[in-house]
Structures are given as structure tokens and as C-alpha cells.
Amino acid sequence: MRLPYSWLREVVAVGASGWDVTPGELEQTLLRIGHEVEEVIPLGPVDGPVTVGRVADIEELTGYKKPIRACAVDIGDRQYREIICGATNFAVGDLVVVALPGATLPGGFTISARKAYGRNSDGMICSAAELNLGADHSGILVLPPGAAEPGADGAGVLGLDDVVFHLAITPDRGYCMSVRGLARELACAYDLDFVDPASNSRVPPLPIEGPVWPLTVQPETGVRRFALRPVIGIDPAAVSPWWLQRRLLLCGIRATCPAVDVTNYVMLELGHPMHAHDRNRISGTLGVRFARSGETAVTLDGIERKLDTADVLIVDDAATAAIGGVMGAASTEVRADSTDVLLEAAIWDPAAVSRTQRRLHLPSEAARRYERTVDPAISVAALDRCARLLADIAGGEVSPTLTDWRGDPPCDDWSPPPIRMGVDVPDRIAGVAYPQGTTARRLAQIGAVVTHDGDTLTVTPPSWRPDLRQPADLVEEVLRLEGLEVIPSVLPPAPAGRGLTAGQQRRRTIGRSLALSGYVEILPTPFLPAGVFDLWGLEADDSRRMTTRVLNPLEADRPQLATTLLPALLEALVRNVSRGLVDVALFAIAQVVQPTEQTRGVGLIPVDRRPTDDEIAMLDASLPRQPQHVAAVLAGLREPRGPWGPGRPVEAADAFEAVRIIARASRVDVTLRPAQYLPWHPGRCAQVFVGESSVGHAGQLHPAVIERSGLPKGTCAVELNLDAIPCSAPLPAPRVSPYPAVFQDVSLVVAADIPAQAVADAVRAGAGDLLEDIALFDVFTGPQIGEHRKSLTFALRFRAPDRTLTEDDASAARDAAVQSAAERVGAVLRG
């Protein structure tokens, strides 16, 4: 949020005459009381002749690809300057800001007289962005009539001695998205008296008489208050004054017409969003209801929006008038000929507004405030302030007719529930002995009503602070206003010698092993892309479809927590390939969330006491399983091309090798067995076992999944459940035999569907302890072997720890290995 220093200072000074601080001091104060200042932006700087001019004549130059205009500009004392300009949003008679030759604009841009498009240009007509008044590059800055006379100092008229604060307001402090809220915070920080700009002394109530506007509100829409007041007979040609336009501009809002400008101004001033409807375009009664299935609405930006049944609408008898809390509809838009305006101030459900604006991708200034909560007590005050401003600027008459729906039954007290707290709780939590009365004084400064009952305070939070729900929230207010810097910085003693846990050590070892093998680690998103399991073709009862849904997700189309790491990895792979990185090997180690049929939600448990054992057990039972997984994906070439050859494409064996890398890092033995498990290819998928426990799958992805997901041909993947793999104790260093090894090869013919791993296991079991290593180095199929059969050739390395082996010793062990393979998998020695 952007706010000018001058506006903040003006509102604070109402209750503290003569108060003044520098922008730098104000920045430090805001930071001290917990508000993040992203940037402090000085306006300008402008050096040299910058003046106000009136456009006296415009000549359209033809023959160019874009509009070019030669403008005669009066800069005072009937001095005319010819200036070439490409903007078209101004006309003869308009007041503009002119930078004359010799002026230097923000960014070090120096203006000089020059020849352009065959004419002499003696200066530049400036936009707001060129003067550092905002980011609007769309056209020239046109001042409203009467803002100044030609020849007036441009820097003075524009107020370029001001500073704009750019703040990041946290979600729990929606009241600070206004001058009212931030000025109150500054008054608290400096111990000043504060005059609320929404109080009756600043906004005297307007008279109320006559019939109310017909209104119906559907139950359960979450609307807490809905107020309406007409303003009749405004001048459609009226223009907002420069002081108002300037403040809107510095806050990042473009001025349009008085009816819209005053609603934006009051929103920035008091923090209450409002909307202006064309009263004459409303048909019949107004109503608030949920959208119907298949219903659409055209919003103010001219786009037809498809609505959801959870969206809340304002409707009349003929059409939708607004999407509640998000944006108005085109049907009741205030237009250039509008003379009668119906002002609306409502309180919408924050969660509903947040869901709607995210789903429709409509992040408006109003929605940003509504989703952080808005003060319901000032709806009518904001309405009256807006109506008075509009009548003052555009003429017309404020109608005494007021509609103020406050719920059913009507609500008269908007304050959150009272909170009881010991008066010394902030002192005990902070470890600071605050002066007597500090807690009550600070809580009263933020607007709370504080009563004493011995050593206990009863605190009723103000209507604009629904975030104050428990004693801890009140403690936070006292501590931040007193200054966090006074709290002693004491670190708790850390027990020495624990180091990393076995699980942490294993995770680090696996990550290093995969990285050394050419894989790149990513941090996967914890959310599932929409429809990913449909792309994979998973059955409806597949356990991976049983997900945990987040009620308020970061992205409306990704509300489900991931039950597998593969979707995030495959998305990253596609993104890399689309940017030209076609040879990709990625991995991730992260938790997944896997609820079961027994996973159940629980209600809120009080936080002002320790939970009972039963409550803790209930909380534990409600948590879904969150095992740690490791997953990897590969595509393109596994071995790069070069002078040595064309390279080797990724194949299923590379995924199997990734499993072995993980197994070696985990110090466990794994077994790979053929499996059919989507999204893997049924003939190139292996189920991974540690002992007899299944821990995951690896192999090449199914061709249909690859095609539907836009993946490179032959993409391979592996995913293992690390929590299902036991953490092994560190292995002792192996004893290296000083005796020479004996090398022999063996070729075995087996059925084509027998896994090579099963044959290797049989050979190892038969060869006994003398077999030091076995490696498959050739697979052969052909008519010589027979139909549906294959030949596997293994390199065997024999070695004894206590003697030199003879060829006869090695051959005997080899023969025993062949016999074992024959008995276990039906292998035949190839002649």
C-alpha cells in the first residue's frame, strides 16, 4: 500500500497540533511498531524550469506511423512554446505540466530544445510517471481546471517536496490499509492524542428521513451490514479537484470521475471500500444473494465472468449490479451522463471475498481490504463522508434517505468479545517490568475499552480489531508499542553433542549422492496441479486421489496437498524443456500428505491453557500421514553427445540405477521386481523392495501419460518412501583382502520375463562368500537363443580373504552359481 507522508502527517496533527517528524524518523517508527516499509519514495527530484502551461493549439502531423501533435502551449504572460508530443489524452484548453529546456527530470533526464518530426520542440509535456508521481505511462498528466494558472511553478503545484511510503500490510492488520489506521498507530507510537477521522466530530451524521431503499439479503451470505444513500443531481461534467486527484495518484489510483474518485478517496482515508451505482440504471429493488449455477456477469472492465454458486452478488430486478466486495458490474456503472448516484457501503465475508477474487483473478483494492476485514461500525460514517465530498465537488443534493441493514436481528454492537487478562501478563512474557498502568494505557490507545477488576483486566477490542481474540494478542500489542528492543535477548541453553538425527544424516547423504550423480535438486510445490491424476489415468479408488484440501489456498485451482512428489517434478521438467534445457535430471526430497479413511478434522481447542491428554490424542489422530519421499525424473540424454558419439538417451535402467544410488546412500539392499503401476510403463516399471517391504517404484513413464502431460519421449521417474526404509547403523569399514582376484564370465539363458535382478540374486546365492562382485554387462536376444528367451552375461569377481584363489576354486564357485540359477529361475548355461 502507498500513502503520502503529507496526508499521514495532516491526520495525526489534528489531535497533536504542531506535531512534525521527518520522513526518515517516520520510517523508523513504523518499523519499530511492526510495519514493514518496503520503500520510501521521494517525489521528483526536479531541477530547472518546470511550469504549468495551457494548451492553446494542437496541429495533427500526418505521414507518421503513430499520432504526432505539434502543440502551442501558453506558459504565462502569453508566451507560447511549440512542443511535439505523441500523447492524445489532452485537448485545447487543458492545463499540463511542461519541462522547459534546461530542466532535469527524475532519473537524470535532461530536457533540451531539439528538432523532431521536422519541427522544433521547445520542451516536453510530462506524464505522471516522468515526474515520479506514479507509474501511469498511459498519457499526459492533465491538471483539473483551476488547479493553477499558466506560468505557475510546476514543482509547487504538484507538491514534489512530498514523500510516498510503500508499506507491506500483514493480513492481520487490515485496519492499517488506510490513513485512519496508520495515523492511529503513529499516535500510539508517539503517545499523542488521536482524533478519529471517522468520529462524529470529523464526520457529523447527515439527517435521516424518508423511506429506505428496498433491499433483501439472502441468509448465510456472510453480509454483516449494507448501507445505501443517494446523491441526486450531480454535474456529469464535474472534475475532481487537484488535491484529491494528487492523493489518489500518489496512492497508485487513477482519477476518473468524481463519483468514483470520492469512493476511492474515502476508502484510502477511512479504510472502508464503497461502490457508486448509477441510480437511474437500477431496476426495482436491490438484493444480496449467492450466484446461481451457470450465471455470468459483465464487470466494470468489460469482461464477462463465469460465476460460482459460492460467489455473493448484488442484484436488481434485471441484472447483476456487483460481485460483492470484488468489483462492480457494467449494468449499473456510473457513466459520463450519470446525474443520480446511489452510494453503497457493505461489510462482506472476508473468506468469501478472498475465494471469489482469487478464482476470478480480480485482485481489487476493495477486495484486498475486505479479505483482511473492514470496520463495520463506520459504514454509515464512510457513506456520509463520501456523499458530502461528492456533493461538494460535483454539486447535487445528498438525499436524507438512508438504508442501513445491520443483520437479522439488527446488530448494534460491533466490538469483538471481551478478553480477560492478568495485568502483569505482558511483563511476565516479555521479562520486562513495565511502569504501572502501561498495559491499560497501551490497550486504550489502540481503541480498546479497558476495565479493572483487581489484578485482572477486561479488555473489549475495538470494532476494527477482530484479530484480537485472546490474551496473547493483547500482549503482542503492548510489547510492540513499548518497543521490542527493550525485551532482553536471552538465548535458551542448547544441549551439546546431539548433532544430526539419523534421518537428517540420511537425507543429506542421499541428496549429495544424487547431486554427485548429475541430478539437480528442486524445492517442489506442496500443492497438486488440477486434474493431474486424470492425466495419469488413475482409478477412482487409487489412494493417491485421497487428498487433503486447503480451505484458503495460495492458488484457487490448487487447493489439494500433494500425495506424491512426481507432479511437481514433472512440471519443473516441462518448464526446463520449454526453455531449451532438454537433457534434464531433477530430484526432490520432501514430505507428502497422505490422509486415510480414519483422518478426521477437529474443532478449535482453547489456547489459554494446556491441552488435555485426550485433546492431544484427538489432534494426533486427526493428522494425515506425512512421510518423507525422495523422487527423481530424467529426460533427454543421460550420456552427452560429443566426439565420442551421439550420446545415450535416458532409459528405464537409469531410473533403476537412481534407486541403487539411494539404496547405497541409505546403506540398505533393495530388490527390483516387475510391476504395473501408473504413471509408469507396464513393461518398464519396477517395484522397489527393502526386504519384503515395498518402498516405491521406478522406471519409464507410460507413453500415454507422457503424451498427455507434454513430456519428452522416454521420460523416466522414480519415487521412494524414505520413511518406509529403515535407518541403518553406520557400516564398519570393509576389510580389504591383500590377495589377487579371479575374474570369470558366465552367460545364462532364461525366459524373457525373468528380471535380471532375480538371476543375479540366484548367482550370488550359489557362488557363496568367494563372490566379491557381480555385474551384468550384456543382454542378447535372437533366433540362436530361442523365442521368448534372452541371454544374460555377468562378469564375476572372486576373491578370498585369507589365501590366493586358484582357477579351480573360482570355477567351482562359478559352477555352484550356475546350478543355483538353474534351480531358482530355470537358467541354462549358454554354450
From Swiss-Prot:
Binding residues for Mg(2+): 467, 473, 476-477
Span of domain tRNA-binding: 44-155
Main location, first listed in the record: cytoplasm
Domain called B5: residue spans: 414-489
Positions of disulphide bridges: none
InterPro entries on file: aa-tRNA-synth_II/BPL/LPL, B3/B4_tRNA-bd, DNA-bd_dom_put_sf, Fdx_antiC-bd, Fdx_antiC-bd_sf, NA-bd_OB-fold, Phe-tRNA-ligase_IIc_bsu, Phe-tRNA-ligase_IIc_bsu_bact
Cellular localisation: Cytoplasm
Cofactor binding mode and count: Binds 2 magnesium ions per tetramer.
Needed cofactors: Mg(2+)
A Pfam family of this chain: B3_4
Domain FDX-ACB: from-to ranges: 737-830
Enzyme Commission number: 6.1.1.20
GO CC, any one term: phenylalanine-tRNA ligase complex
This protein's UniProt keywords: Aminoacyl-tRNA synthetase, ATP-binding, Cytoplasm, Ligase, Magnesium, Metal-binding, Nucleotide-binding, Protein biosynthesis, RNA-binding, tRNA-binding
Family from the record: Belongs to the phenylalanyl-tRNA synthetase beta subunit family. Type 1 subfamily.
Subunit structure and binding partners: Tetramer of two alpha and two beta subunits.
Protein name per the record: Phenylalanine--tRNA ligase beta subunit
Source organism per UniProt: Mycobacterium bovis (strain ATCC BAA-935 / AF2122/97)
Lineage, opening ranks: Bacteria, Bacillati, Actinomycetota, Actinomycetes, Mycobacteriales
